[in-house]
Amino acid sequence: MSGPNPNKQPVELNRTSLFWGLLLIFILAVLFSSYFFN
């Protein structure tokens, strides 16, 4: 995440962190579901 002014857009950073958080939860859910089904 390279930018000229990273502190100028806190909303963008919040959206990025929220996106990665949801992605991590989705991956964990897929792993747990595959673990339970096998």
From Swiss-Prot:
The keyword Plastid applies. This is Photosystem II reaction center protein L. It comes from the Eukaryota. Keywords: Chloroplast, Membrane, Photosynthesis, Photosystem II, Plastid, Reaction center, Thylakoid, Transmembrane, Transmembrane helix. Belongs to the PsbL family. The keyword Coiled coil does not apply. The chain crosses the membrane at residues 17-37. The lineage of its organism: Eukaryota, Cryptophyceae, Pyrenomonadales, Geminigeraceae, Guillardia. One of its GO terms (cellular component) is chloroplast thylakoid membrane. It is a single-pass membrane protein. Signal peptide: none annotated. One of the components of the core complex of photosystem II (PSII). PSII is a light-driven water:plastoquinone oxidoreductase that uses light energy to abstract electrons from H(2)O, generating O(2) and a proton gradient subsequently used for ATP formation. It consists of a core antenna complex that captures photons, and an electron transfer chain that converts photonic excitation into a charge separation. This subunit is found at the monomer-monomer interface and is required for correct PSII assembly and/or dimerization. It is found in: Plastid, Chloroplast thylakoid membrane. It comes from Guillardia theta. GO terms for biological process: photosynthesis.
